[in-house]
Structure formats: C-alpha cells, structure tokens
C-alpha cells in the first residue's frame, strides 16, 4: 500500500498512475463539523458540537459543578504556541470549549489565501488535543474587536474566557464577557525558550518568502 495525501484529487490520480498504483477513494464524506465525531482516533466522547447541541451538554456539566472555560481563535497552522496556550487555559477550568473561526470569516479578517487549513481540518486538530474538551465553529457575524464568537459565548456563559495578554481587542472582549457574566482571564504568551516562539502568520510569511 502507498498512502498519498493531497487535497487535489486529480493530482493524486496522476501520481498513482505514474507509480502504477490503483486509487481507492475513502467512503467517508465530510458534511459538517459533526461528521468529525465519527473519525478515528477519538477519545470515546463527542468533542465536536453544533450550536444547537451546546445547551444539552452544558446542563450536565453545570449539574456536576464543572468550571467552564472558553477561548476562540483561527488556529490556522497549529504550532507550539497554541499547545502552550491550551495548557494555560486548562489550568483555569475543568472543561474547555474552543470556538474556531469559519473559513469565510477568517478570509474576511485576514484576506485572500487564508485560512491555509479548512475549518474542518482546524477543528479536527484542536479536538485531538487532550486539553480541549469541546470544539464549536464560530458565527458568521463579525462584531467590533473581530469578535465572531459572540453567540457561542452568550450560549455557553462560561465561568472564564481566556485570552492572550497581547490580544489586539482586549477591551471589546472584556465588554462581551461582562454582558454574559464571564470572568476575563489574560495569560502571557510563554513559549519555552527551546521552542520557536512563532505564529501562524509568521510561518505563512516565511513560507511565502522561500
């Protein structure tokens, strides 16, 4: 067997033909974020939620007295800084909800060519992280402060909303927290010295300059 991964189906077929291989297309069809729950590996629980499922999940969590945390972002190219951030988030809560920006919204905020990875790819990678308990897609509306997650925040009403201390819209997000009764917690970007302190945007810029 030879496994060749590529988003371009025709390129895969051409490469297989060149190597004298037969192509087998997966039967799995990605319809929406909920489809990710059927992928392997998983951790025995449903991590990917749509908006209508949030309330039922919260009922049990709050009944069990769990402290709910919330964060949001693009998470385009998952890297060490993200891993450290989620670890910091989990230290402040029992259950962490992550809202990931939709492709259409990220394109509006960051321009053509972004995101590099689709919303389903980004959501799936987030769900694979042990610190992340639930993943939801952000909304279509963009409020001041580049807030595309307000409906999720309002629905979840987390105990804490965790944010990097160098975020460009801290005050706008602080007001959003006040409206839903959440405490805003700022964490410092604290990537260990032996890891590259980088970001998705920096990685993309470096690749484009090569």
Predicted segments, located by residue:
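Nucleotidyltransferase catalytic core that binds NTPs
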Residues: 1-210
């Amino acid at each position: 067997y030879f496994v060749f991964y590529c988003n371009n189906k025709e390129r895969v077929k051409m490469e297989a033909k060149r190597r004298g291989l037969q192509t087998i297309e997966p039967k799995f069809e990605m319809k929406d974020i909920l489809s990710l729950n059927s992928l392997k590996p998983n951790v025995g629980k449903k991590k990917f939620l749509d908006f209508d499922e949030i309330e039922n999940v919260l009922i049990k969590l709050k009944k069990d007295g769990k402290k709910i945390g919330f964060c949001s972002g693009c998470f385009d190219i998952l890297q060490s800084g993200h891993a450290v951030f989620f670890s910091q988030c989990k230290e402040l809560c029992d259950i962490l909800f992550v809202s990931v920006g939709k492709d259409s919204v990220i394109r509006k905020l960051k321009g053509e060519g972004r995101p590099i990875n689709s919303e389903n790819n980004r959501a799936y990678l987030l769900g694979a992280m042990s610190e992340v308990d639930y993943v939801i897609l952000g909304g279509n509306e963009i409020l001041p402060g580049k807030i595309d997650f307000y409906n999720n925040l309002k629905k979840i009403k987390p105990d804490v909303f965790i944010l990097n201390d160098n975020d460009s819209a801290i005050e706008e997000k602080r007001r959003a927290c006040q409206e839903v009764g959440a405490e805003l917690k700022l964490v410092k970007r604290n990537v260990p010295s032996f890891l590259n302190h980088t970001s998705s945007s920096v990685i993309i810029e470096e690749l484009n300059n090569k």
